[in-house]
Amino acid sequence: MPRNEKKTGQSASPRKLRVGELVRHAVAEILSQGGVHDPVLETHLITVPEVRMSPDLKLATVYVMPLGGKDEKPVLAALEQHKRFLRGEVARRVNLKYAPDLRFRIDERFAEAERIEKLLRTPAVQKDLSGEEET
C-alpha cells in the first residue's frame, strides 16, 4: 500500500499532495545548497524522496536517505538538531498559513527494493520464473 493511502483505502487529498511536494522541494533545495551549516550534513548528499503532510498541514513527515545509505543515524540526528532552522526556511519558501513542524524519518523503500531484488535472484525463484516444473 502506498504511503499516501490511509488504511481505509482512501487516497490523500490533492492539497496534501501538492503541499507535500512544495515542502519536499524546499527541503531538498535547502540541503543541496548547503543552507545548513553542519559538518555531518555538509559531507553527505541527502535525497528527499517524499514528504507526507498531516490532514491539517501542520505536520510534515520528511523521508530522507543519505546517498549510499551510509551514516543514517548521524544524518538523522543532524537534521533533528537543525529542525527549527529548516522549518523557518521552509516557511519562507512555501506560502502557507502555518509553517509545518518537520519530522524526519529514514526512507526504507530503497532497502525494501533491494531485499525484493535479492529474493528475485534466488535460484528457487529463477527456476519458477523460467517455467521449469518439479515432478
UniProtKB/Swiss-Prot annotation:
Biological process annotations from GO: maturation of SSU-rRNA
- Check the record and name the InterPro entries matching this protein: KH_dom-like_a/b, RbfA, RbfA_dom_sf, Ribosome-bd_factorA_CS
Q: Does the entry annotate any disulfide bonds, and if so which pairs?
A: none
Q: Which PROSITE patterns match?
A: RBFA
Alphabetical keyword list: Cytoplasm, Ribosome biogenesis
A single cellular component GO annotation: cytosol
Q: Where in the cell is it found?
A: Cytoplasm
Q: Name one GO molecular function term.
A: ribosomal small subunit binding
**Biological function:** One of several proteins that assist in the late maturation steps of the functional core of the 30S ribosomal subunit. Associates with free 30S ribosomal subunits (but not with 30S subunits that are part of 70S ribosomes or polysomes). Required for efficient processing of 16S rRNA. May interact with the 5'-terminal helix region of 16S rRNA.
What family is it from?
Answer: Belongs to the RbfA family.
The record's note on quaternary structure and interaction partners says: Monomer. Binds 30S ribosomal subunits, but not 50S ribosomal subunits or 70S ribosomes.
Q: What is this protein called?
A: Ribosome-binding factor A
Question: Species name for this entry?
Answer: Rhodopseudomonas palustris (strain HaA2)
Q: Which gene encodes it?
A: rbfA
